[in-house]
Amino acid sequence: MPLEMDQKISKHTFGCQRSSTSDDDSGCAMEEYTWVPPGLRPEQVQLYFACLPEEKVPYVNSVGEKCRIKQLLYQLPPHDNEVRYCQSLSEEEKKELQMFSAQRKKEALGRGNIKMLSRAVMHAMCEKCGEKINGGEIAIFVSRAGPGVCWHPSCFVCSTCNELLVDLIYFYQDGKIHCGRHHAELLKPRCSACDEIIFADECTEAEGRHWHMNHFSCYECETVLGGQRYIMKDGRPFCCGCFESHYAEYCESCGEHIGVDHAQMTYDGQHWHATETCFSCAQCKVSLLGCPFLPKKGRIYCSKACSLGEDVHASDSSDSAFQSARSRESRRSVRMGKSSRSADQCRQSLLLSPALNYKFPGMSGNADDTLSRKMDDLSISRQGAGFDNDFWKARDEQETPEDHEEWAEHDDYMTQLLLKFGEKGLFQQAPEDNRSNEHWMSDNIKGKNDLQRNSRNQSLASKKYQSDMYWAQSQDGLGDSAYGSHPGPASSRKLQELDMDHGASGYMHEKMPWYKRSLECLSDNLKPQNENICDSMDSLALSNITGASVDRENKPRPSLFSYQNFQDLNTRDCEKMSNMGTLNSSMLNRSTESLKSLNSEICQEKPPPEEKPMHTSALRRSKSQTRPQVKFSDDVIDNGDCGSIDIRQPPMSERSRRRVYNFEERSQRPHHHRRRKSRKSRSENALHLATESKPSGRERNPRFYTAEDYEKLFHNRSAHEVQAYIQNADLFGQYPNAASNFGLPSQVVDKFLGLYGEDEDSWCSTCSSSSSDSEEEGYFLGQPIPKPLPQRYQYFSDDLCSPTNALSSSQFSQRTTKSKKKKGHKGKNCIIS
């Protein structure tokens, strides 16, 4: 019943039914089918077609009928058997075709026999699928394979194409059944162009297929490709010209055809010439052959920075952090009103300077001139004359129309700024003769000073190549605000970095950073004419592009250069970088390097022998110790005779952030018997070098000395004392780890020589072995004898081979006479063995 329903549905679906009653091989009238197996009864025919897929059943005017016709033409090609269906065979090939067809029919051709297995057969197996065929089921037997070999009706397929053998016609070869097409191909090659068997002796074989010699041609122009280059496209051969005109790809970079001779790179449907110019970064044009790349919006890039459109040529490898950090810090900057260019433009113009060496300013350009300028800035007369007047007021009064031809020729903004302001007020001091004060200088230094004086009349061409000096000035003098940076996250991170470095080794804090020497708590009118050579971190934090703060534009300008060893500049820690890519101003001007043997040529006189020398051990401090701080804070300054001082404080919104760092937790050792001070009060400017208060809490009022006091004291000294002091300066200049500010023969140090009459924490009992308790031994002609700052002697044990040889006892015989020292307060610079 289901079979009848299926037949009715099939008839209604295709809209027709068999009306002919022709006789078939079975001798039965099968009106429904175009073909039925021969020798079967109608019920057996129905059982056979029931085993086949529905689309393969050859119903009249059905899909199965069309499929049968198609398979007849494909599996049994007529041109494989009949000469009349062939196109261009020679007489010899025709004869060979006839012989070939007859041989196949004789040796391999056959038709399958459909039989119903008896119920007694128990072990029949399908040759194709290997499954058991039960008794009473339909099976197909092949006489050429033997009596016991059988297949399921649905498994009787060609061994090559797995298609049902049309009308059960097979060709048996080597134990397998094939359709007529694939059986012929087992014996002879077939032409891929004309689909005929190739009987000729020569043929063309390509891509695993065969062609007649004249049939292997271009699919478009039919040019014979035998022995020539060709390109296969969709199974069809093309000559190079036709392929390029119809199927060649276009390069995404240059837009030209990618020829067959050119290698190409393909990604996501895009094509490039496999060359360094075409397959390269779309932004920086660097070659990407053999390199990973970043695809974005149909283009390829070498990095994420290029994909974002950043100009990599405007920066170097150390500038990537600079760009990101400066963009955040630029919103916190205070710019000068005349500055119309952005901080990023200033940075780029400086980084692109041709002769720039920002790590070592004295190593590029004219190094001799740079050293001469440094030394001339440090001379006493220049410092005395350069800061007698208020600098910024003097600059405003002396400001004249600039020479356009001199500074306007520079594209570099920082060079324009320094040419415009530097030589006219910032770096130009009063041109008074200072040779009278150069008696303490060596011939080599004097020669360099003469060279500096002669170099003041340089032309503009020579100034163009002094970008190293301008860079150093912009870093030291103008501060970070020239690039739009004020204390913020960067400064905080730098302080944290210094804090962490201190925990590792005390070396960073043993050196004398330049920002430790400021007196911002004092008013501007009380500031002396020549400050210490180093500025403070706080004044740098409020400095704008001209070097003046927002509130304190009338602050005097400090000297720009540290008096350090010029030959050892490249071996020092000047390469410390801030977290924004530029030289950290707080690290650049370390004054621990001294100029070697400054007075070694002229200061060879020995002290009078009648003074008994006292061998004093070299003052050494361990690297974990930190420097004691001497600074007048706001609460200390308002007492005594300083209560009437008019202190000008900036508003709270513009004060730089300060952070207190206590290093007591970092390195506490039993022999460190001294008070520690936070970084907030760490300022060792020469103006602040007053004595510390006693443990009882009694505070001293600061004493201030003017230039007249200094000159009186200096001229009242005897030649012996001056010579001894000069030798001390020579001695401390020989060791690079000694603080350079002591050896510096500047007005800053000598002005306050009388400030250290009594310092109860300066020397410990072990270093001060004098038995004299007289109060008059520390004075000469009514003036206190100058004493060195104990905290300034930074000697490490590895730098001095012999403490006794390093410090002659005669030089310290006058400085160790004070015995009013409490034994409970050990010296800050001594190690108790």
From Swiss-Prot:
Region Disordered, annotated ranges: 1-22, 312-346, 432-456, 603-702, 767-786, 805-833
Keywords for the protein's UniProt record, in alphabetical order: Cell membrane, Developmental protein, Gastrulation, LIM domain, Lipoprotein, Membrane, Metal-binding, Methylation, Prenylation, Repeat, Zinc
InterPro entries: LIM1_prickle (IPR033725), LIM2_prickle (IPR033726), LIM3_prickle (IPR033727), PET_domain (IPR010442), PET_prickle (IPR033723), Pk/Esn/Tes (IPR047120), Znf_LIM (IPR001781)
CDD domains listed in its UniProt record: LIM1_Prickle, LIM2_Prickle, LIM3_Prickle, PET_Prickle
Any one of the GO BP annotations: convergent extension involved in gastrulation
Subcellular location(s) per record: Cell membrane
GO function terms (MF aspect): zinc ion binding
Lipidation (S-farnesyl cysteine): 830
This protein's GO CC annotations: plasma membrane
Metal-binding listed as a keyword: yes
Propeptide: 831-833
Span of domain PET: 14-122
Described purpose of this protein according to its UniProt entry: Acts in a planar cell polarity (PCP) complex; polarization along the apical/basal axis of epithelial cells. Regulates the polarized assembly of fibronectrin on the surface of the mesoderm during gastrulation. Essential for gastrulation cell movements, cooperating with dvl2/dsh to activate jnk. Acts together with tes to control axial elongation.
Protein name per its UniProtKB record: Prickle-like protein 1
Gene source species: Xenopus tropicalis (Western clawed frog)
